[in-house]
Amino acid sequence: MPTGQKMSGYDYFKTDSAAENDSTLVILDNEILYDKGRYIDGRLYLQQSFVQDNVNMRFYYDKESNAVLYSDWSAVYTYYPDVKGYRDQNGNTYDTEYEVIKTADGVIYIDFEYMAAVSNISYEYAKEPQRLVLHTTHEEQNEVTIRKNTVVRYRAGIKSKVLEKVKKGTVCQYVGAVDDDWIEVITPSGYQGYVKKNAASDVYTAVPEDTYTEEYQSNLCGYKVNMTWFQVTQRAANAYIDTYLEDVSGINTISPTWYSIADGTGELTSLASDTFVSNMHARGLKVWPLVNDFNNNVDYAAFYSSKTARTKLINNLMQEARQYGYDGYNIDFEYVKKDFADDYLQFLRELSIACQNNGLVLSVDNYKPANHNAHYELAEQAVFVDYIVIMGYDEHYAGSDAGSVASLPFVEDGISRAVSMVPSEQVINAVPFYTRIWTENAGETKSRAVGMQAAMDAMQENGATAEWDETTGQYYCTYETSAGTVQIWFEEDRSIGEKMKLYSKYKLGGVAEWKLGLETSSVWSIISNGLNYAS
């Protein structure tokens, strides 16, 4: 005879009814969490750090101002603790009937329903114990639909206690089959237990519906970007740009490496030239100066976490853009560490809004996506910036084992990973105009970076020949010298042509090249043809 005895929800969720008071359980994607939520003045609030880390990273805590900032594509909103209403970066104020941000026992909380209204989540409230069942994932999952009113049991058997009654039509997550009679499910209220197999439908797959879709306003160019970097280490070098461009064709954007963060206050060092900009505009080229983080005297953790410093840098960049007439910026911040990545992302949000308001295209350079640099959060960047530039090189680098700088599989893997997170029309893949000449001797490996022609000259001077390597999509040669065994994986017309086929395959937004001056002139038509084919 089946038992109808019910297990207490307090026992199942291992919580004490006497201690419940204003606290509430949070079940996040089927994980039971304690002390993350509480009711304050009759409203449910969640810990801000929990929200930022797990639910919506745009609710960012700004340490300097002791406020929570929320950004959409058009504005940054500031919420001060225990104050009704909020304001945007232009000083506009907005009223609320409750405090969006509250503090309790030294902890900062966010009003749940306010946060949920701008988050792509689904949720349910349940009682005994009071709890919030919260789902943030939108990946395909297995489900069943309950076919008749039934019960979910603690164990797979009719003598096991009842966790919950479920009605016909209830959709449950399917965990797995126990035997021919019982299946394991997760109910909408957060119970994980067992139902009779004949009480549920066959298993099917479903993707949770989006509950919130933000409207983006990217400032895309409307054509395939062909951007080349022009490395400038001193201001006088700007005068030589015409020489560098003599045999160049097909580019529509140039990025001179003019700016670097000077200090932790938001000041810049500049190598800018108004003559250069006028010259490029006369040629029909857009100018997106590069800004780097290569000054190792700057405490970047402190810089990114300071709203004052971030704002000063952004204001300085906007002033430079107005003064010189730039068309955009290229951000090349390569030393972002995981412990201040949230602050870096907030900087990009704030910079993107300033660029939108000033008609500037914002592109951001990123490493080939990998687990170790996942904190760069390409998907989140793409919500705000216009173009994500993947640096599709440095597969092997100074100090590594000998190998290709940018083999075809390496490049395609980077592109494939990027477009899985970023709309393809926002992705620009950068190709190298350089390679490395590797020398191995007595177990020691050394290399030097050279341009396309210099690599071919080295091979010819040593009487060597190269053979096409299908695996890397490059010509390869090796020869012996008095210094040791030399290996070269070449970048030239054919290898670049193979890479350009990927632009059509993945429908990318454009190409970039590092760097102007290292190429052979014939490669420009290869790149242009590849982009035209991709259009």
Predicted regions and their residues:
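Glycan-recognition patch characteristic of GH18 chitinases/ENGases
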Residues: 207-316
